[in-house]
């Protein structure tokens, strides 16, 4: 029975996946089927434990779970014994002096020394400290912070076989490492087990293992060894007689280190008998093919949890005895051919958690592994399974293919696996289960197919799997119960949850007579009728949660005699009458979150132990037949319903856990829990309980030491009147017949008294806060209640409310807020608190409160009180609190507070007090708090009153917001008092003095009330007490006495200078914004450049990406070229060739006054990546960074600053950086660009043919200009159709140049006109030349390059000369031919050179042509008068060419 109850504690279904790597994982159970049934499939258990290797090695005694902290000297042991041979020593640390006293371990064979983990101090191990322990066989040192293990540290332990040393130095610090020496293990010839784990080791010294020739187990886990060579196997040169170190080693654990690679030289081949190698949890990313060479005895290798991407061929070739290979959790994406070749003894291969694909797992991967039992390929990237993949794995029993992307499995793929009993194909992409998929799996007992895309299950798919016991088809796309299940007569658990099954009939589970667990959660099942489960006689767990079930027919489960647990939660059930009453075996029933309205205990079977009906609409826990002995429910969850009342019959007597929270319970019947002897917990929080009596929570007597039942009552609107005072004391009751309230801090009370907060936490209430209202009350011993003048009769005054506590020790009379002018009559004589605030009492008459000897608190604040008569508070001997604040009191004469010897708190703030006589406070011997702030007091010797009347009893005083005098004598005394009583004075920051302002004199202080407008407030410095009095506090003005009039001009000059400095600082700080504003609004460029080169072809050249051409043409260029004033802008992808060379780009920048870069992500990825553009920009800006303007996108700032070539420009202050997102973008851009207001000049080019007379120059073209083509026409949109057909002009060598070539053929919307020569036919021109040029380049196989657009400019830059010299540079095209042509060239006039340059270069477009012709003709006219013959010999170079060549 206990086992069954454990099965019923879970809600969700989970089929346990059996894994050979975790053999201790439990079989699927009934809790997994809610459940599931019990699995009985026999599995092969492969042990990963190597205790057989250590069977002859005694182990050190374990450390106690909670060892006592050692006390006393550091080296003094706190001994504990486990038997006669095992000893445990606990101490703080090991010190060299005095030596470690091990007398308590004499004769023992096992010793554990554990240092305190709380002391991070270095321990020192003396040499031969264990020499006296001749019989010791096992030694363990734990948590001792050793930094060195000296030579011969264990001398004398000749019989020691096991040594475990764990310093945990990494907890001390990353640099605290344990240093070993070659002879640290000297004398331990019998040592077989050495554990050096968790020591923060960096390396093992050479020859460290030489003294321990019989060592079999070496543990180096959790250290910081980074290279395999640092483990000391490579250079183990032991002397003669020492034997071969490591020859007997069988187990090596180097996991959890920092190894990155393993080469063939790490020396592990010396370990001939090594059987187990653990290198897991390192940083291995590379292995040598000879890393495991020589390990012929190796049986287990663990390389899991590393970073291996591939493995070398022949890695395991020398280890034919391998049994297990663990390669999980790496980054393997391929396996070399023959990796497992001839490993015929291999039993386990784990390749899970890698990146293997089906292209690298084929029929040769596992060939020859005929003894393989476990194969784990889970969490990889397999997409298909070939029918030959597992062709030789005849003895395979467990195959895990979980979490791949397998979408296709060939027929008969598992046919060779006739011993397979566990197959996991979960979390793949299978769509169909065909008839031949599981052929050959005759002994398959567990099949997992959840989380696929299965929608079709063919009828004969399981015909060869008749022994299947566990089947998981959850989370697929099934629409019905597969008919193929009828072949599984031995099936015990079936999971069909999370599918789309709508209905099933009486034949759906035919032949499943052994089925014990059925899971159908989260489907679309409708109603349940008789016969649906009739073929499941052994069904014990049924999960139908999260469906659409509205009704269950009576008798639907009559054939299921063994049904023990049912889940029907989250359905639409409205009635369960007669459905479950006959299920005598039912123990667990979940009906939560349905639509149940009616519930009765007659609906459930008598043996039910666990019932969940929360989240319904149940209004009462009915028990019509008053069943108590017949009900055995122990856990009942009826929360989140509509229950309004509970009583003794609502709760079974066997109940242990009761959850009825979040209901509408407003009444708990008395003794509702008395008969519940096993009650442990009741949740009643979040209900509607307002009143609760102590007897209503009474429980059955609980005998100690059994704990009291736990009740939770928070979240109820309790009205904490005088009947609820027990709630604070319930946990302190000693009768043990009441529960323990566990959430006392969460209980809140609705207070019946209107004073204070309406809702207060229970923990903050006092006993006198639990009050009940009354109108009239007469005590039992009072005999005068029938008479009018009866002092013992409690009658509440009219228009007042009165309250009392449980024992009438507190009597509150609240007459506040009535605005009455008369004190209430017949206030009860036993009143303890009286509220008279918020009324209108101009005068408090004498003897107004006579006879109220129990009055403790009186509130007369805010009642317009202007005077208090003599003996008003007479006979109030118990009064402790008196509130007179917010009234109109002006003077206290000294008799007001007589006989108030018990008064502790007096509130006089916010009145109009100007005078308080010294005797006023004398009777207040017990005063602890007084407030006189917010009045009109001028002088009050409060320090004398304090010393005379209060002494040390006064704890709080408030003096602020008065009109204290600034007279020297008074002010010194006041400031000294405040400074000396800083802990008592609560409002020192509000204390100030009032002095007469200038012109009024000291007479203003004589009547401060009438002259308040002529006073000025002055702050007081309480840190300068005792200082000499000055006229500052005497009433004079500062200007009259403090500052001489002669200093006024100097002060004015200083202020003017300060103002000027502030203005200059602001102008300097915002100088850039000011410049831009002045330029944008008035056209004034302040502090601009002294000289701006105006004789330039363009104002700016704009470098941008071709992808940004639309924005550049339609926005930037349009705004700049059409604005006022218009600018001449050269666009890179409009006015230059698309593949412009370095020289073309360089010249374009040199004839422009500014270089503008549109810095976008497209520009960085395209244009800036070109070497020609970067080189041109650098050359053009060399020494002139102010010429650069950068328009940058905000999102590319980080990428731009990451560019090492672009960063200097971005960090230079002379460069203009403008963000496109700046709201003053256009103003800043125009300010950064040069502006020349246009001057009208005459145009030398007209349409009249008579005005032009050009000579035709015939001469061979320069060889350096052969490979040039004209630029494309300058246009932005498709509307510019003129000149689109212009083609490059090419001039062959020695060809004559016609005069027509002096003019551009590339035009824009407005082409540049040229004159027509005499005899020239219209339409003739360069067409023939173009054809000739095309033939020339086609004949020579050459592509004509772009023509330089500025070669026709006759200016200071000498473009033709520059180009000639550039072409003569090494690597320039045509350099040698150019030099020869220049030597052979004779002198010609400048005009003739100009025509030659125009013929060779061509033009850019209309704008370039017009500007070029204008400059050419102007310069021609100037040069005709003074010809300047120049020898074009290559010896003279332009200034820019010389600078470039330098």
UniProtKB/Swiss-Prot annotation:
Tissue: Expressed in the fan-shaped body and the ellipsoid body, which are components of the locomotion center in the CNS (at protein level).
Cytoplasmic face of the membrane: 1071-1446
Membrane topology qualifier: Single-pass type I membrane protein
Region forming the signal peptide: 1-16
Low complexity: compositionally biased ranges: 1414-1426
Stretches forming LRR repeats: 133-156, 158-180, 188-211, 213-235, 246-270, 271-294, 295-318, 320-342, 344-368, 369-392, 393-416, 417-440, 442-464, 465-488, 489-511, 513-535, 536-559, 561-582, 584-605, 606-629, 631-652, 653-675, 677-699, 828-851, 852-875, 876-899, 900-923, 925-947, 951-979
Disulfide bonds: 722-772, 796-802, 800-815, 966-993
Induction: Up-regulated during vesicular stomatitis virus (VSV) infection.
Keywords from the named record: Cell membrane, Developmental protein, Disulfide bond, Immunity, Innate immunity, Leucine-rich repeat, Membrane, NAD, Receptor, Repeat, Signal, Transmembrane, Transmembrane helix
Disruption phenotype: Mistargeting of VA1d ORN axons to a medial position. No effect on the immune response to septic injury using a mixture of Gram-positive and Gram-negative bacteria; adults are able induce expression of antibacterial peptide genes (Drs, AttA, DptA and Mtk) and mount a proper innate immune response. RNAi-mediated knockdown results in adults that are acutely sensitive to the vesicular stomatitis virus (vsv). Following infection with vsv adult survival is decreased, and adults show a dramatic increase in viral RNA production 6 days post vsv infection and viral replication 9 days post infection.
InterPro entries found in the cross-reference section: Cys-rich_flank_reg_C, Leu-rich_rpt, Leu-rich_rpt_typical-subtyp, LRR_dom_sf, SLRP, TIR_dom, Toll_tir_struct_dom_sf
SMART domains named in the record: LRR_BAC, LRR_SD22, LRR_TYP, LRRCT, TIR
Residue ranges, annotated region (Disordered): 1301-1332, 1388-1446
Domain of life: Eukaryota
Transmembrane segment boundaries: 1050-1070
Residue ranges annotated for the LRRCT domain, each copy included: 716-773
Domain TIR: 1096-1233
Protein's GO biological process: axon guidance; cell surface pattern recognition receptor signaling pathway; defense response to virus; detection of virus; innate immune response; positive regulation of antimicrobial peptide production; positive regulation of autophagy; regulation of defense response to virus
Family annotation (PROSITE patterns): LRR, TIR
Chief localisation class: membrane
Bias-annotated ranges (Polar residues): 1395-1413, 1427-1439
One Pfam family named in its UniProt record: TIR_2
Subcellular localization: Cell membrane
Family note: Belongs to the Toll-like receptor family.
Protein's job: Toll-related receptor which binds to the neurotrophins NT1 and spz5. Essential for antiviral autophagy, it detects and binds to the vesicular stomatitis virus (vsv) following infection. This role is likely to be independent of the canonical Toll, immune deficiency, and JAK-STAT signaling pathways. Functions in olfactory circuit assembly by promoting synaptic partner matching between olfactory receptor neurons (ORN) axons and projection neurons (PN) dendrites partners in the antennal lobe.
Protein name from the UniProt record: Toll-like receptor 7
Chain's gene name: Toll-7
